[in-house]
Amino acid sequence: MANQRIRIRLKSFDHRLIDQSAQEIVDTAKRTGAQVCGPVPLPTRIERFNVLTSPHVNKDARDQYEIRTHKRMLDIVQPTDKTVDALMKLDLAAGVDVQIALG
């Protein structure tokens, strides 16, 4: 797999979980002899919701909620066949969304 790159994007609502998963990927890639760039923290997406607490009047009384989506990106440069096999067998946490792109 000469002159190839694997780009991995991770998304999660919990920053501790995403950092732990990124560290597992980095350790696995380095153990199999590939170079790793990252993890690079990407901007956190913050969604805010305002909900009226009263069912009828009192528009001033509201609850505010937010969801933070944390993102990380890793580049694995010059992956070996062992690296690809190890990444396929890697078991990550359920709360982490993984997107893999070959380039």
UniProtKB/Swiss-Prot annotation:
The keyword Iron-sulfur does not apply. It comes from the Bacteria. One of its GO terms (molecular function) is structural constituent of ribosome. InterPro entries: Ribosomal_uS10, Ribosomal_uS10_CS, Ribosomal_uS10_dom, Ribosomal_uS10_dom_sf. SMART domains: Ribosomal_S10. Pfam families: Ribosomal_S10. NCBIfam families: PRK00596.1, rpsJ_bact. Belongs to the universal ribosomal protein uS10 family. Part of the 30S ribosomal subunit. This is Small ribosomal subunit protein uS10. It comes from Psychrobacter sp. (strain PRwf-1).
